[in-house]
Amino acid sequence: SKELNVFGGFYSGKDYNYLVFGQNNTAESDSKEVVRVVKYTKSWSKVNSCSISGVNTTKPFSAGSLRMEEAGGKLYVYTCHEMYADSDGINHQANMLFTIDESSMSLTDSMYDVSNLTDGYVSHSFNQFIKADESGKYIYRVDHSESSNYTMNGSYLSVNGITLTKYKADGKSTAVSVSI
């Protein structure tokens, strides 16, 4: 049965299965649980879960997808959300990322606030992809968006709505490049 009323996604990891659920938060409460990541054995016995509250989210998984990847004992949950209303009263949509320690199921890092492309923020992000390299040292994320051609220091960050972000698995964004 569903843990929360909105299904986000499924991931079959090396040793465990993961399901992600969510619920709407139209009251914009920072204390309301909006995402729950649930860890199961391969025979579907529940092991543990990670509850994520508020995170600037009114509607989790809105107008996009959810994908997961594991590397170095961490589970990366990459998805999207409709955010709290801005100063003009508009609820914009963007990507969001959660990093969870697989053994404790505790949240170790997150990205959900309005930011910029150098931090990996993409709005609007309609399709999210995430993959670790073979060493597990780098995490790559790709978003399908409606973005135009943006440049920073003469380098393209997003072209024709495709944005590629490279992260060190143990840190923040190290570089942004685009491949079409």
Task: Give the label of every model feature segment.
Residues N24-S29, E82-D88, S145-Y150:
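Short glycine/acidic-enriched loop and turn motifs that connect beta-strands
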Residues D15-V20, G73-Y78, S135-Y140:
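Entry beta-strands of beta-propeller and related beta-repeat scaffolds
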Residues P60-E70, L75-V77, E82, S87-N95, ...:
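Eukaryote-skewed repeat-based solenoidal scaffolds used as protein-protein interaction platforms
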Residues K46-G54, L107-S115, T165-S179:
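Beta-propeller fold detector
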Residues K32-W44, I90-S106, N153-D170:
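Beta-propeller blade signature
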Residues E3-G13, T58-M68, N116-E134, I180:
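Repeated scaffold domains used in trafficking and secretory/extracellular systems
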Residues S125-G171, V176-V178:
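Long, internal scaffold/assembly segments composed of regular secondary structure
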